[in-house]
Design a protein with these regions (language model features):
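Bacterial N-terminal signal peptides
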Residues: 5-16
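A sequence-level detector of short, solvent-exposed, charge-rich linear segments
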Residues: 16, 78, 135-138
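N-terminal secretory signal peptides
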Residues: 20-108, 115-118
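Mature extracytoplasmic/lumenal regions of exported proteins
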Residues: 100-181
Length: 181
């Protein structure tokens, strides 16, 4: 009985803490989801994996030297479909513009076109999961699609009050809209 009461108190506290930020986060998420339409990629086989089959918003990278993980797919067995392994290179853009990037197998240049595969809004950050629209040339002459997770950190109050111009301005410094579907 004691454990049940503790569980109820814990769940109630968690819900109470999230009520204030839940509405604003969903507002930010809704506005950004409307602005950054999600794309879908196809991974039927190893030779054609990463082809964009449903194009959403196309973004243009505004900076040079951004890391990207090489697209990886897996298959449980020979009869199951292939699926995308969510192995993104993470680039974190802090509140003051400080950048932290993980090393990765690909480097993307200014002007690289990207599509959005997913968008998440947390209490203190916006995460945009991207995929290169065209394959990127590797040093050995092969080409592969790249995957990068952009994490834009914000003061929780900025997202709680749904300050869309501030959020959009920070994202636009890195990712501009090339075309929207």
């Amino acid at each position: 009985m004691y454990r049940l009461m503790l569980l109820l108190v814990g769940v109630s506290a968690a819900l109470a803490a999230s009520v204030g930020t839940g509405y604003a986060s969903s507002t930010v998420r809704d506005v950004l989801s409307e602005r950054f339409k999600v794309s879908r990629i196809d991974v039927p086989n190893q030779f054609d994996e990463g082809h964009v089959i449903k194009k959403g918003t196309v973004l243009r990278l505004q900076v040079d030297g951004v890391p990207a993980g090489m697209l990886r797919t897996t298959q449980i067995n020979t009869k199951s479909p292939r699926f995308h392994v969510h192995d993104y290179a993470r680039v974190t853009v802090g509140e003051k513009g400080l950048i932290r990037a993980e090393p990765a197998s690909l480097t993307l240049g200014n002007g690289t076109r990207l599509v959005v595969l997913d968008l998440k809004v947390d209490r203190d950050r916006v995460r945009i999961f991207t995929h290169t629209l065209e394959p990127v040339r590797l040093p050995d002459g092969r080409s592969a699609h790249g995957c990068t997770e952009f994490v834009f950190a914000f003061d929780p109050a900025t997202l709680a009050r749904a300050d869309i111009p501030t959020v959009s301005a920070r994202i636009d410094q890195w990712l501009s809209i090339a075309s929207a579907s």
